[in-house]
């Protein structure tokens, strides 16, 4: 997870809330036959997976409590054997929580009432040091819940979870 310096260009100027974005990529050796890297941005399936992962993760974060920080969750698939969307959401959640914890510890992510104004920042304002309890409380405010995903399908009339590629390909419903 990378915390960017600013918010996306399309965000309102002087926004007080943050944004979570996801990027998803199958590495060339992640499938049985070599998968060619996508050029010039994500295409159909990849773009839709990125949107699903980002929406899922934004659902676990209070973007106002996060503050004006843009974060990108990178989902690099090393071994694609079914369930890559679910793995991206679950692992992305863990990585996002750890990144938020680091931002809080560094003073970049502060409770709303402790944030410096734009003028304060220009004047060289120093963020306050939070106690360990204040850091834990703010982490809970920013990310009160975790999110995880699990694939479910109906294969030969039986409900199955965590489908691999073969089961997913043969599922009646997934």
What is the predicted function of each stretch?
Residues 1-174:
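Polyanion-binding surfaces on beta-sheet-dominated domains and ring/shell assemblies
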């Amino acid at each position: 997870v990378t915390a960017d310096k600013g918010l996306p260009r399309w965000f309102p100027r002087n926004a007080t809330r943050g944004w979570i974005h996801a990027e998803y990529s199958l590495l060339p050796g992640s499938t049985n036959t070599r998968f060619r890297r996508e050029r010039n941005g994500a295409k159909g399936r990849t773009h839709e997976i990125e949107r699903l992962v980002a929406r899922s993760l934004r659902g676990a974060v209070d973007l106002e409590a996060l503050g004006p920080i843009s974060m990108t969750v990178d989902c690099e698939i090393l071994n694609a054997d079914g369930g890559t969307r679910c793995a991206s959401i679950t692992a992305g959640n863990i990585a996002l929580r750890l990144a938020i914890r680091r931002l809080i510890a560094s003073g970049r992510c502060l409770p709303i009432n402790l944030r410096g104004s734009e003028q304060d920042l220009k004047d060289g304002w120093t963020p306050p040091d939070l106690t360990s309890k204040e850091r834990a409380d703010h982490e809970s405010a920013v990310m009160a819940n975790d999110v995880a995903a699990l694939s479910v399908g109906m294969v030969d009339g039986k409900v199955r979870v965590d489908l691999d590629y073969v089961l997913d390909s043969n599922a009646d419903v997934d």
